From Swiss-Prot:
Its EC number is 5.4.2.7. Pathway: Carbohydrate degradation; 2-deoxy-D-ribose 1-phosphate degradation; D-glyceraldehyde 3-phosphate and acetaldehyde from 2-deoxy-alpha-D-ribose 1-phosphate: step 1/2. GO terms for cellular component: cytosol. Mn(2+) 2 binds at D298, H303, H351. GO terms for biological process: 2-deoxyribose 1-phosphate catabolic process; 5-phosphoribose 1-diphosphate biosynthetic process; metabolic compound salvage; nucleotide metabolic process. This is Phosphopentomutase. It holds the Pfam family Metalloenzyme. Gene3D superfamilies: Alkaline Phosphatase, subunit A, Phosphopentomutase.
Length: 403
């Protein structure tokens, strides 16, 4: 059994690998998720060229149908499998929290028909700004600013919308509603959505810039989450004095709980990879865990149902993967996974209920191949066993498989 000095977990946000067994219990625009397959459909529809992930074993992961343009490796350099979600949700928080060992049996509240008048009125009274009622429904984040951004620029009204996720999002043009004001309004919205019937996973500030017809969301997004309801493996590590580094929106997702080094938000996937490599190179980071989220797959291409853009984003990550591998020390372990699906060829605009891939690599590996299929929380149990801390609620370690 290997024991690694450092483990680096990279979440490719929304890069699912085929419909989960219970996918038909979830839907997009009235269409059950049972036929969703993020990687499979991208590979089939627009082609997928990811030789570096293929070398680690991406094409070796068992599937009903092989990935069309990602061949299995006869001698992969890593271990591979797919993992199933048990929690009742397909949102970012649920996925990440389960990866860190929690089972979410009661999902957060979602608002398919928009938020109740009581919430909107409270936000209006607090902010002194009106809320655009027509935007108050599940909406694509880019479409909502295209549709209501011009009106906001004229009136200063707030754009409040939601999605299939348990989130309240406030979009604000940075020249009309300053960032400090937007963040203050979001903090208030967080304070009034902490219990049922409006228990939301996140309040998200969605600033943007530009002119009508050419709006662009900025990297000044900020998430206001709730802390996990029980200790995750992040907390177990932190309590044991083991370093935990967060790259990208990880700190927001866990509300800082169990994280003792926040490396900041990502401006892009490429910036996030730069930050990860910088983190891996820190001389003080001798032992511990880094946790990175790369969100562009989901935010820029999955929700927009842009299969070509999604494919290109995967290509860009794959091209930079050798840099990550080169930054590893001999006794490091790299885990690459996802948190849910977001099939860009599917109905609707929201996440899809899918298996997630898992690729594992270490310079110290003497073996490779496919390991048994498991569940999201197995990642956290493996991390816990490696560092000698107690696991969280659920999960079975696969550390013994990594040789």
């Amino acid at each position: 059994m290997s024991t690694f000095d450092r483990i680096h977990l990279v979440v490719l946000d929304s890069v699912g690998i085929g419909a989960a067994p219970d996918a038909n219990n979830f839907q997009n625009a009235g269409v059950p998720d049972g036929a969703s397959d993020t990687l499979g459909h991208i590979s089939k529809a627009v082609g997928l060229d990811v030789p570096n992930m293929a070398k680690l074993g991406l094409g070796n992961i068992p599937r009903p149908q092989a990935l069309k343009t990602v061949a299995a490796e006869s001698n992969p350099t890593g271990y591979a499998t797919k993992l199933e979600e048990v929690s009742l949700g397909k949102d970012t928080m649920t996925g990440h929290w389960e990866i860190m060992g929690l089972n979410i049996t009661e999902p957060f509240d979602t608002f398919w028909n928009g938020f109740p008048e009581e919430i909107l009125t409270k936000i209006e009274e607090f902010s002194g700004r009106k809320v655009i009622r027509e935007a108050n429904k599940p909406y694509s984040g880019t479409a909502v600013i295209d549709d209501f951004g011009p009106r906001q620029m004229e009136t200063g009204e707030l754009i409040i919308y939601t999605s299939a996720d348990p989130v309240l999002q406030i979009a604000a043009h940075e020249d009309i509603i300053p960032l400090e004001e937007l963040y203050r309004i979001c903090e208030y919205a967080r304070s009034i959505t902490l219990e049922r019937p409006a228990l939301l996973g996140r309040i998200i500030a969605r600033p943007y810039v530009g002119e009508p017809g050419n709006f662009t969301r900025t990297s000044n997004r900020h998430d206001y989450a709730v802390s996990p309801f029980e200790d995750t493996v992040l907390n177990k590590l932190d309590q044991a004095g083991i370093d935990t580094y967060a790259v990208g929106k990880i700190n927001d997702i866990f509300n800082g709980s169990g994280i003792n080094h926040d490396m900041g938000h990502n401006k892009s996937n490429s910036h996030g990879i730069d930050t990860l490599i910088k983190t891996m190179g820190l001389t003080a980071f001798e032992k511990g865990f880094s946790f990175t989220n790369l969100v562009d797959f989901d935010a820029l291409y999955g929700h927009r149902r842009d299969a070509f853009g999604y494919r290109d984003c995967l290509h860009e990550f794959d091209q930079r993967l050798p840099e990550i591998l080169s930054a590893m020390r001999d006794n490091d372990l790299l885990l690459i996974t996802a948190d849910h699906g977001n099939d860009p060829t599917y109905a609707g605009t929201d996440h899809t209920r899918e298996f997630i891939p898992l690729l594992a690599y270490s310079p110290s590996f003497k073996g490779s191949g496919v390991i048994p299929q498991g569940h999201f929380a197995d990642i956290s149990a493996t991390i816990a066993e490696n560092f000698g801390v107690e696991r969280a609620m659920i999960g079975q370690s696969f550390l013994a498989e990594l040789k």
